[in-house]
Amino acid sequence: MKTKTHRTPTRSDRSIVQLVAHCACILAIVSITSRGVLEAADDQKQSELEASYFSPPIQVTQGLTKAGEGYFSPDSTRICYQGVPQGYPFYQIFTQPFDMQSPQPTSAQRISPGRGRTTCSYFSPDNQKLLFASSHLDPNMQQTEDAAINQAKEDAQSGRRRRYQWDFDPYSDIFAFDFDSKSLTRLTNAPGYDAECSFSADGKTIVFVSDRDGDPDIFLMNADGSGVRQLTNVPGYDGGPFFSPNGKWITFRSDRIEKDMLHIHVMRSDGEGDQALTDGKSVQWAPFWHPTKPWMIWTGADHSDPEKRPNYDLYLMRYSVDGDNFIPGPTIRMTDHPGADVLPVFSPDGNHLMWTASRSSDRVSQLWFSTINLDALELSLNRAAALSLPQQQ
């Protein structure tokens, strides 16, 4: 485990991190209508690039002010996600039935208690539990809610649209909801922010983020909340961790290379072998593993030109592993439409993709689903690899 100088991060330290820690760069927030699946806006139609990689995206959530950060259940019969209910200022956690053969919005069931900020839901591998982070035990909940509601009213009157920002809520803890007993078990109870949690493939270990040591770092704990151990200990934000399918690696995002410039990292599941996979004046975040292929997908945007608005798109990397060495390979861009495409996840069979976007005509952030063309992606990765080879003289 690496060491660092202890510090307490400030709001300015976290300006970009707060922007993208969960559902960043989502476009305008307006109430969704009661219509069926919304039509894609004219400027959001699928491009030639996108059409070569995946089927026309289908919106699979509606009825909430906005929704995002979705994940499939292990058997692909449900999805979980966070959404903002009508008339309430904070995200709550929902699940809904899902038909892979006929994807469409269905009736959502709220799983979280209904108050406070909630985020980062994730199914257990045995499909019996749902992890999520929640601040519903905030002792000042009424004041917290009132402040957010009053701010929303002021913004509505003035027409102001605030940049998306997620607070590192000091009352956020990790909970596990049991689908059979309908009980909620608290797994963390340390001062500060605990969130951004997911299971290992065997269901025995949870990887999560906590700022209990002064800034957000990555930790492990047993599935029952015991045996907490720290993996990263370097100044800056480390977050959004996920185990590889074989449990030997963890990918995450970090701004330790340069303040506010998030990049994709990978390390072994014991915290050793930490390395950055991306670099430069860009924000790269929300990495997620393909379940069967040596691929990793994430969201990225160029931030090198301060006069240019960054556009977040999806990128796919092929990697290889040689013993304890993780070797990044060619990377291709998968989306190129004008809005933000963020938080991509593969289905358990690896044939489908779900992500957060604002592709409907009303520009509300929702979850979208597509079937991916594995052969086309493999071919493009092969071409990218060939172009990166040294040219013979």
Report residues per predicted region.
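Low-complexity, intrinsically disordered segments with a bias for serine/threonine
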Residues: 16-19, 204
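Residue-level detector of bioactive/disordered segments in secreted/extracellular proteins
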Residues: 14, 25-27, 152-156
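N-terminal secretory signal peptides that target proteins for export/translocation
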Residues: 1-17
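Intrinsically disordered, low-complexity segments enriched in glycine/proline and serine/threonine
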Residues: 5-7, 21, 369
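Intrinsic disorder/low-complexity segments enriched in polar/small residues
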Residues: 3-5, 19, 40, 392-393
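Bacterial N-terminal signal peptides
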Residues: 20-35
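Sequence signature of WD/YWTD-type beta-propeller architectures
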Residues: 38-393
